[in-house]
Amino acid sequence: MVEDHKHEESILEKIVEKIHGHGDSSSLSDSDDDKKSTSSSSSSFKSKIYRLFGREKPVHKVLGGGKPADIFLWRNKKVSGGVLGAVTASWVLFELFEYHLLAFLCHFAIFALAALFLWSNACTFIHKSTPHIPEVHIPEDPILQLVSGLRIEINRGLTLLRNIASGKDVKKFILVIAGLWVLSIIGSCYNFLTLFYTATVLLFTIPVLYEKYEDKVDAYGEKAMREIKKQYAVLDEKVLRKVISKIPRGALNKKKD
């Protein structure tokens, strides 16, 4: 009797363990399913986040990556500060002090050559070794890469202007005309050096600030784009469609052909 009782107890214990084990596994599977659902929902939420100008890559990749992007995003503060300081000093020298570029280059070359010439001759009198002047060569590959990149961007710009001039996209036409008009106003107020310095300062400040406050800027950008689309829809309905409707259909068919 005792053995039968123990046997029954062991059977009951095994049954209870199986029930608990099944419950634990089911709870684990439920938790895994919950994690998967939350991760999928979070990933879908992230994919729905609005990015300025339809950007899908990080700011570092948008700027081209590598060392130039590191400089613009202040990854190395000493290098970025040195470049911005040199550009600022050049602008102050040429713009505020009204020093001309050709005169500056000539005076700098005169000073450097005279200093090296006197130093080399002085070393012979005091019986010291002459200063080592390193050989400077411009490498070919970076120049070719720069020219190739400029060629690609210029061709893209020419293709865009050609498509706009063909009359296929009214929206791009209006945006380009407005942009050129704004640039003409800015260019009439400032010279090329000031514009270059302003663009450099903006390039060293806007990307790093945007990277820091990316979510807030994208939220405001989304609201602004919605408002712009609303205003463009009103303009398209009240003005553009009326203008296009007044154009003879024969002229439109010729443009399409």
Swiss-Prot record:
The keyword Protein biosynthesis does not apply. GO terms for cellular component: cytoplasmic side of endoplasmic reticulum membrane; endoplasmic reticulum; endoplasmic reticulum membrane; endoplasmic reticulum tubular network; plasma membrane; plasmodesma. Keywords: Endoplasmic reticulum, Membrane, Transmembrane, Transmembrane helix. Pfam families: Reticulon. It is a multi-pass membrane protein. Residues 68-257 form the Reticulon domain. The chain crosses the membrane at residues 78-98, 99-119, 173-193. Residues 19-42 are annotated as: Disordered. It is found in: Endoplasmic reticulum membrane. One of its GO terms (biological process) is response to bacterium. Interacts with VirB2. Plays a role in the Agrobacterium-mediated plant transformation via its interaction with VirB2, the major component of the T-pilus. This is Reticulon-like protein B4. The gene is RTNLB4.
